[in-house]
Amino acid sequence: IAADSGTLSDDECYTVTNEINQAFVDTIRATGGNNENRFLLIAGFGTDITNTCDSRFVMPTDSADSKLLVSVHYYDPSGYCIMTSLSSWGDKNDYESQNETLEKMTKFTDEGYGVIIGEYGVLIEQNDLKDGTLDYYTNFLNNCDLYGYAPMLWDCNNLYDRNAGKIIYDDIAAFYQSRSVS
C-alpha cells in the first residue's frame, strides 16, 4: 500500500491480481475429480485488453495442460460503445485502432491460451443504431475470426427481447444470422 495514500499502486494491483488468479487455479485443481483438468477462465486485469497485455499481468501456472483461458471485455472507443459522446464509427483511425487493440491479445494465443472476449457491444440510443454499428461489429468479428477469439455479445437491455426470445432489431438479427456457422 502506498504509504501516503492508503491505496495500492499499479504495480501492487498487478501483484495482487496475479496472486488471486494463482490461488484460484491452485484451489480448483486441488479439489480433484474433473477439476483437475477442467478449463478455467482467468479474468484479465480489469478485463481491459491494454492492461491485460501489460507485462505485469502474468497468467497463473497450471498443473493441467492447455486448460487456461483469458477473458477481457471490449468497448472501445467507450464514447461510441457505452456512452453518447461519439455517434459514429468507421473512419480509417477507428479501424486501425480496433485492429491494433485486438491484435494485442495474440500475446496470449501465441502462448497457447484461449481468448474469450466476454463482453462487447454498442449501446443503442433511443431505439436507433448508431452510425457504423454494423461496420464496427463486422470488423470486430473479423478480427476475432482471424485470431481465434471467442466473442460474447453483451446486451444492455435494449438489444434482445427476453419475452419474445429474439433480437429486437431486424438488421442486427440479419447480420448475426449471416455470420452463423451451421
What do these predicted ranges mean?
Residues 69-72, 97-99, 143-146, 180-181:
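Short, surface-exposed, polar/charged, turn-prone segments marking secondary-structure boundaries
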Residues 1-86, 103-122, 146:
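Active-site region of glycoside hydrolase catalytic domains
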Residues 8-19, 92-96, 128-135:
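Alpha-helix N-cap and loop-to-helix initiation/capping positions
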Residues 97-105, 134-141:
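Short, acidic/polar
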Residues 48-50, 91, 122-123, 169, ...:
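Alpha-helix initiation/capping motif
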Residues 84-98:
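Gly/Pro-rich active-site loop or hairpin
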Residues 2, 46-52, 95-96, 123-134, ...:
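Acidic-and-aromatic substrate-binding clefts and catalytic sites of carbohydrate-active enzymes
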Residues 62, 127-182:
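Aromatic-rich peripheral "rim/lid" segments of glycoside hydrolase catalytic domains that contact
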